């Protein structure tokens, strides 16, 4: 599928803007800024200063250390190339989002010095919505999970910390980092919708396996035991004495006040996690009626990822066993029918937020032209859990990140990719079956792509390097 600049995700189209300075969310932002200032004289502050890069080469030493492979343009050209392209798309997406919203950086708002004062003047009037370090860190880490799945938890943890470092440095608010990571998930949709980019990722993974002397990852359909473990890469739920928990409380009370409104009615309906309901709420945004009869391949794909997303939260739910808000406060929810069944089920992360977000990511890859509408509905599906009283806000936020990590991991699993291919063919009106072909047949008949991932309608006529199948082709 050919994608253009106008297709690049804009956070403002499906995510909330910066918080009002009169809101509890801003109070949480300010508290996190103050925490960050306190961290600057510690070892975490030293790491934060090192993390504050703006170019791709600034991030690579971290991943090189994690993987035990020196990632450079000369040593790992395939890995470098795919990361370089990804960074370019991230820059465009961040710029597009900032054209919609301006948020003044913390150090500039308070007329203070940041952790890296040499660049303060340069970035003082550049919006921090969304956080570039959070976007880059989470995006590069999700892609590296596809290249190096054996290190997935360590990679994701480090990717999360890049955003945290920008808070410590005084360059981003906490809310900016949340937007940045969610935007990164949408960017993964964008690159996967370009078939040529998938070939570049495959070449990068093969290069990693060669350089690290590792065997390729076993093909198959991912089980939840192999999914990234959120206990290892996400922070624990907020402590009761923290400002973040105060924000959780504020969101819970605000959500409770909406239960008699139209948004409350939607939240009550969203408590339905049946396949029929999920398909119905995404059909409008998707642009086609999704059902077992009308779109059997898409339906099957949604069914599979819904279950996997739920399972991706299981380890963290059992590990933290966070008490749900309605149980903790001896309160009622908007949908009493599920209260008894979920009373002993851990609240963190939110399974509903996770599978809603993962379904949104998957449907957007099938129809990227509807990305903003689909992902906005996925976001609101998760927010309904706060209004309903079944989850705290931090549970829902963690659910989206868990889904993003699972989305990346799924893209190296052959059964998922085969079902995704069937779903895309079904959406385009072609046969839902996939004809078996030999490797030579596939390579010779495969379309050509530019190194930027743009599919060509015919064989290239201009000189340059192209991708066909899993191979580079040079047109002289």
What positions do the PLM features span?
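Hydrophobic alpha-helical bundle signature of multipass membrane enzymes
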Residues: 3-172, 182, 190-200, 206-388, ...
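Residue-level detector of functionally pivotal "anchor" positions at catalytic/ligand-binding pockets or at interdomain
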Residues: 430-452
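Surface-exposed, short loops/turns at beta-strand junctions within beta-sandwich domains
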Residues: 460-462
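C-terminal tail/sorting-segment detector
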Residues: 465-476
């Amino acid at each position: 599928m050919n994608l253009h600049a106008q297709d690049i995700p804009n956070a403002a189209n499906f995510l909330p803007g910066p918080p009002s300075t009169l809101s509890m969310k801003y109070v949480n932002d300010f508290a996190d800024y103050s925490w960050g200032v306190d961290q600057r004289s510690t070892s975490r502050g030293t790491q934060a200063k090192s993390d504050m890069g703006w170019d791709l080469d600034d991030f690579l030493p971290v991943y090189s250390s994690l993987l035990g492979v020196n990632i450079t343009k000369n040593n790992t050209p395939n890995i470098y190339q795919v990361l370089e392209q990804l960074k370019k798309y991230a820059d465009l997406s961040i710029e597009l989002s900032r054209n919609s919203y301006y948020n003044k950086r913390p150090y500039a708002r308070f007329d203070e010095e940041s952790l890296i004062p040499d660049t303060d003047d340069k970035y003082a009037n550049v919006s921090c919505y969304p956080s570039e370090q959070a976007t880059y860190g989470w995006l590069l880490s999700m892609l590296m999970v596809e290249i190096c799945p054996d290190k997935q938890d360590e990679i994701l943890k480090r990717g999360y910390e890049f955003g945290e470092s920008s808070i410590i440095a005084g360059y981003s608010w906490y809310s900016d980092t949340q937007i940045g990571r969610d935007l990164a998930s949408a960017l993964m949709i964008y690159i996967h919708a370009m078939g040529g980019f998938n070939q570049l990722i495959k070449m990068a993974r093969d290069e990693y396996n060669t350089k690290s002397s590792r065997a390729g990852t076993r093909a198959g359909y991912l089980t939840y035991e192999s999914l990234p473990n959120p206990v290892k890469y996400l922070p624990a739920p907020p402590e009761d004495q923290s400002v973040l928990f105060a924000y959780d409380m504020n969101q819970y009370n605000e959500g409770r006040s909406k239960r008699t409104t139209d948004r409350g009615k939607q939240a009550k309906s969203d408590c339905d996690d049946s396949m029929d309901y999920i398909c119905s709420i995404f059909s409008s945004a998707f642009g086609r009626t999704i059902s077992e009869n009308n779109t059997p391949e898409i339906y099957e794909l949604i069914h599979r990822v819904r279950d996997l997303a739920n399972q991706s939260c299981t380890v963290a739910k059992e590990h933290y066993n966070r008490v749900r808000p309605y149980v903790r406060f001896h309160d009622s929810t908007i949908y009493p029918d599920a209260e008894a069944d979920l009373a002993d089920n851990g609240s963190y992360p939110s399974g509903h937020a996770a599978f809603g977000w993962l379904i949104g990511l998957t449907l957007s890859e099938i129809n990227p032209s509807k990305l903003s509408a689909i992902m906005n509905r996925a976001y609101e599906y998760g927010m309904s859990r706060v209004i309903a009283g079944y989850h705290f806000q931090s549970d829902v936020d963690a659910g989206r990140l868990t889904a993003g990590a699972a989305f990346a991991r799924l893209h190296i699993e052959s059964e998922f990719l085969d079902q995704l291919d069937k779903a895309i063919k079904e959406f385009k009106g072609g046969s839902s079956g996939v004809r078996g072909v030999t490797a030579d047949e596939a390579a010779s008949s495969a379309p050509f792509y530019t190194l930027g991932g743009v599919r060509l309608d015919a064989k290239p006529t201009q000189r340059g390097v192209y991708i066909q199948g899993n191979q580079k082709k040079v047109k002289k």
